[in-house]
Amino acid sequence: DLYRSIAAKEKEFTLDPRQSFNLRQEGMQFYHRYLSLHQLKDYQGVIRDTRHNLDILNVIANYAGTVENITSQQHRPYVMMMNTSAKTMLKLEDNDKLEALRILKAGVRQIKHVYKNVLEDPQPDLSPEIFQLRELQHRITDDGVPTELPVLEKLEIELQMALLSENY
């Protein structure tokens, strides 16, 4: 919010690398929290924190240099996936499978758009985020309300996300 308010006042506002780094560090703190909240099934908290991280990514996209922007935007699909997953799970808690599926499909479309138009990836369907949302969709349509992922799958996802976020 601070940087947005400054940007609103200053026409030529840009984030320097240090400010971008500080925003990314803040995003990492929120990342760790929303991962924990997801495990605790606090989906409202996940939605709140992922929105915050998407806001951070928007500020970086609008006001940071190219290197900082590229470094940060690679995380956008994952944050969007977590946001979509939490919204979906809330609808499933309300037994609203149709709305849950609508949210999932919209999330997949939005993530594909980011992969194609922001990250310039010609094959977004191969991304781990799309895979996870499709897996959730499959579990909803075939098996009812999804169950917990098997431990091996969770570990594989965590490894992929750690590699993407360079957090190993």
Question: Where do the model's predicted regions map?
Answer:
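Short amphipathic alpha-helical segments, especially helix-boundary/capping motifs
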Residues: 7-11, 60-65, 131-136
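Charged, alpha-helical scaffolding/interaction elements associated with membrane systems
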Residues: 40, 94, 161-165
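C-terminal accessory/binding modules appended to enzymatic or scaffolding proteins
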Residues: 141-167
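Ampipathic, surface-exposed secondary-structure segments
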Residues: 108-149
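Acidic, Ser/Thr-rich low-complexity linear motifs
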Residues: 15-18, 62-78, 116-128
